[in-house]
Amino acid sequence: MALQTTNTWETLAQLLPSRNHDQDFWWKVTGRQLAVLLEAAGYPIERQYNTLLFHYHWAIPYLGPAPASGVAKWPSQLSVDGSPIEYSWKWNTKSKAPDVRYTMEPMSEFTGTKLDPLNQRAFRELLHKLSQFVPDVDLAPTDYFMSTLFDHDRSVLMKAVDDGVPLQFSSTALAFEFLDKGLLLKTYYAPRKLETGHFVLKDWDTAIRGYYPESKALDIVYEFLKTSPEGELMNPYHLAVDNVKDGRLKFYFQSPHRTFTSVREILTIGGRVQREGLEEQLLSLRDLLNALTGQSPDFPEDGEPPIVEEDVTADLDTDGHPELMSGYLYYFDIAPGAALPEIRFYVPIRRYCKSDLDLAQSLTAWMAANGRGTYCQQYLDLVHSLAEHREISKDRGLQRYIACLLAKNGEIEVTTYLAPETYEQVRRSQKTAV
């Protein structure tokens, strides 16, 4: 039976005061969803309370207006339906329990107006407040990239608002990772020049090198992009930083190819990554991808898994980058002093699965077969709970991405990204009421 609520949620729902219509809506919906995630992942009761109280006091006030209809006033690219939040479930390994995280695009009453045409005011305000509350938060990378990645001629932006130029693209986001060691903050940046459109690699390089002037790992990334046939096809689209001292930088790219041959080339950086057990990891990863995309174990490495159905909503969550749904996504994880980057890749899985139930069953079957089945039933119950507004045996889209990283310890790190579908829930309830 799907877990619809938890004891921690019920207790807090009774004790925490009502604030206003908007915040009460987001707390009722996302607070309960987060509570179910934490319970399913086996978080101790104390950490469940701490995480939910953090969400209530810090995130809820910045989720913007409650949906008055099924259409978002400022549709966030974090989700297909425009919801300003996305959850992630980092799967357990043989020795470690799952981790829960969520990413949000902070919003306010001024989002999209002449006062805040790019919706960055709430992002900066929330970060400033958190820096005074959360230990070890470092806003230096945020200050730097906000000053170098975006247009700052406000007169141009305000004129664009007056002229009706569509500026509704998500340019910043903030992630909270609730770990055993404490809270980790990450910030995301997706710049776009008003006159010329998206950044090209040269623009990114100028900005990144200003903050990371000496990086062997970054040098390797650029060398790969210039010399590998696969690297030459990759398109940069945003970056993220850990907001701690000497934090990592994550540089995101899209590849148009969906073959495992392409995946192998990029994850090994053209053969530059070499270590014992790597080939076994790659073969296990291939098995996982074949299972997730519904292919047989002998599906050729140079074959592209068929798309179940063209995604007509692709534009809604890719910041005008519809090509981001046409291939696989990657990021290069640049750590200070590292000789090589780590690489994580993402499959926009809703394009390849028959239904959310089929995907969840395929994923949990692979986990169980690889000695990681401890939380499989909890995950299946979680998917049912988040999708109480629709049939997961017929619909798809709740599970948006599957991300994988070949860890140095021989494990494959797997993360599922889940959509709250708040606007979709409103749309469906309105249809039912008619």
Curated annotation (Swiss-Prot):
The keyword Transferase applies. Pathway: Secondary metabolite biosynthesis. Keywords: Transferase. GO terms for biological process: alkaloid metabolic process. It comes from the Eukaryota. One of its GO terms (molecular function) is prenyltransferase activity. Disruption phenotype: Leads to the accumulation of the unprenylated derivatives violaceoid C and violaceoid A. InterPro entries: Aro_prenylTrfase, Aro_prenylTrfase_DMATS, DMATS-type_fun. It holds the Pfam family Trp_DMAT. Its EC number is 2.5.1.-. Substrate binds at residues 101, 248, 250, 252, 346. L-tryptophan binds at residue 86. The PKS fogA releases the carboxylic acid (8E,10E,12E)-3,5,7-trihydroxytetradeca-8,10,12-trienoic acid as its product, as well as derivatives with one and two double bonds. Belongs to the tryptophan dimethylallyltransferase family. This is Prenyltransferase fogH. The gene is fogH.
